[in-house]
C-alpha cells in the first residue's frame, strides 16, 4: 500500500456532479474532482497510518500532490503533513512556506497553519522566521 496507490484511488473516486458545486463554493479558484471531505478522509486514513511507520516525510509525494490541478490533491498533501507533523524538522520550514504561498487559499492555509504551528512549538527558534512571514 503506497502513497502512489492513494492517488489512483482519488482519481477513481472522482464525481463530476459534485465537482461543480465545490468549485463554485471556492469561487472557481481551483478545479475539483468532486470528492467530499469525509470520503476523502476515509480514502487516505489507511495510507497515512502506513506512512507513519516510515517515520519520515515523503516530500516527493507532497510535491506531486501540490503540483496536480484538482484541489483535493492539495488537501491530501496538507493532511498528510498534518498526520506526519511529528516527523518534521526545522529544515522543513522553507518547504512548508512554499506550500503556504503556492496555490494559497484559506482552505489549505487552515490546515497548514496547524502544521507550521506544531513545528514552531517544537523549535521556538523558528518564531523569528514566522515574524518575517507576517511582514511579507
For each of these PLM feature ranges, what is it?
Residues 1-136:
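Alpha-helical scaffold domains
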Amino acid at each position: 500500500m503506497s502513497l502512489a496507490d492513494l492517488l489512483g484511488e482519488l482519481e477513481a473516486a472522482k464525481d463530476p456532479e459534485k465537482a461543480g458545486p465545490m468549485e463554485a463554493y471556492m469561487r472557481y479558484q481551483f478545479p475539483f474532482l468532486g470528492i467530499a471531505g469525509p470520503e476523502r478522509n476515509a480514502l487516505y486514513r489507511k495510507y497515512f497510518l502506513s506512512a507513519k511507520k516510515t517515520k519520515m516525510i515523503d516530500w516527493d509525494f507532497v510535491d506531486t500532490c501540490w503540483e496536480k490541478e484538482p484541489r483535493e490533491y492539495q488537501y491530501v498533501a496538507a493532511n498528510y503533513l498534518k498526520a506526519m507533523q511529528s516527523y518534521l524538522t526545522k529544515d522543513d520550514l522553507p518547504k512548508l512556506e512554499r506550500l503556504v504561498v503556492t496555490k494559497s487559499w484559506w482552505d489549505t492555509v487552515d490546515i497548514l497553519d496547524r502544521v507550521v504551528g506544531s513545528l514552531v512549538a517544537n523549535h521556538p527558534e523558528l518564531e523569528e522566521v514566522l515574524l518575517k512571514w507576517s511582514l511579507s
